[in-house]
């Protein structure tokens, strides 16, 4: 059974034991008069059950933290190395997130599993914001979703605008070839003027930066080049061979998209594992604090029960000798 399944099981086990009523004190006379024989030890039994469940949950969260740390170390170096793939495109084409186009495709990258803080909610929030920002009578925004968590949120209010849904992307370690095939499939199945890739850029275990990378279609690149600016510098390059400018821009757009996607997937995976490490560490500390409070409650309850029994024994002995 996976760690997440075990955590859910312990949560269900602990849920019936958590209630708004305080644990009855064994010193309460009314409860002692009305309770059946042996009911005086029920308070300590409830606390012991809670302590057992909290200990089990703490073991699971610590194990999940260690697993996330191991996965993060495996991905982090690859993510840092992949940054060199898309940076030349930024130097050549610039980053034009504010370019005005009619057909926008938002590629939202999320995780398939939860318990990783708010990275998925952040990506979905930005994706919805891009949809509203690029809305208009002559404009349309479509979504390409990577990951179960973004799918579950975006499908509620944007189902008709979702073009492609891809899940279990992180099930096996990804390489550039696999991501480039995925990028080609996306380009073949959507019509776009601009692709907006939404992901979380890894900075540290406790920090990630929500990021939007823009990839323009060859037609929009030509239009922006004619208008001047950063893309206007493309006209200064000489074209060698028999390829036309349109063909070169088409190949450039496809290669740029696959490089940006590869980096985005790895960066988001790093952010996911870092956020999961942080969340599980916080959960483990909270479980430890709860365990300390339950231990104190258990000792007090047990001491009160023993004191009550001693009082009864002494009272009975006094009655016999009196």
Positions of PLM-derived features:
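C-terminal beta-strand-loop-alpha-helix "lid" module of Rossmann-like NAD(P)-dependent dehydrogenases
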Residues: 2-322
